[in-house]
Amino acid sequence: MNPVPPNPTTNAPAPGGATHPTPAGSGSPAAASPTFSPLYQQIKALITQSLQSGEWKPGELIPSEVELAGRFKVSQGTVRKAIDELAAENLVMRRQGKGTFVSTHHEARAHFRFLRLVPDEGVAHYPESKFIDVKRVRAPADVARLLDLKSGDAVIFIKRVQSFDAVPTIIEELWLPGLIFKGLTAERLVEYKGPMYGLFETEFGTRMIRASEQIRAVCADAGAAGLLGVAAGTPLLGAERVSFTYGDKPVELRRGLYLTAQHHYQNELN
């Protein structure tokens, strides 16, 4: 049994809502044969489209499995499998006895999903931020490439120092596409008390879905040493992260330097 919206002769919609029809008139057997995706993957793509379009806002309850099964004319088991995958990807959250909700960066557990630096002792908590610089600039070539922009396009540049218990620990430089984050100012960043990704989600309609990160050992130069209150040459952890929203669209480049004297980088792999 197929759901009504997808066309069975095309690929299922990608998470960003794109479809990829099989090219017509191709002479190769591979191109001439239609490509099918499992039914639950088609349903997953359709639900993701609704999330991306804002039909269900972050933090809102989505329709029940029974309601979604009726909407897409598929079995409840097919819907459940689709939602299981969405939950595994942190796009939705199941709450026992309450239903399934759209994930939000305002959830307490989401605060540490993208912050992997945790204390060697004690309970992990969110750092305090001091903004060093916030300005609108032209994207350098390397930044433009990583954000899928043109060199010279407008970006928002943010530099901040984050401290745990008044100890400077993280230096971050961020680049955000200027069109998406138009209106983001230093004043707004300072007055906003929640996680930065929560601000992006609420005021700019941009939710971080996943990130790709590169990590290497570096030494503090004079500038970093001064901001962190350590000697030049102190070992630091350097990380470059590109974060993506729906449709695998890059919307943030973040370069960080981490002092690990009292913290360590922790990740869970599954």
Residues covered by each model-derived region:
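Extreme N-terminal segment that seeds HTH/winged-HTH DNA-binding domains in transcriptional regulators
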Residues: M1-V74
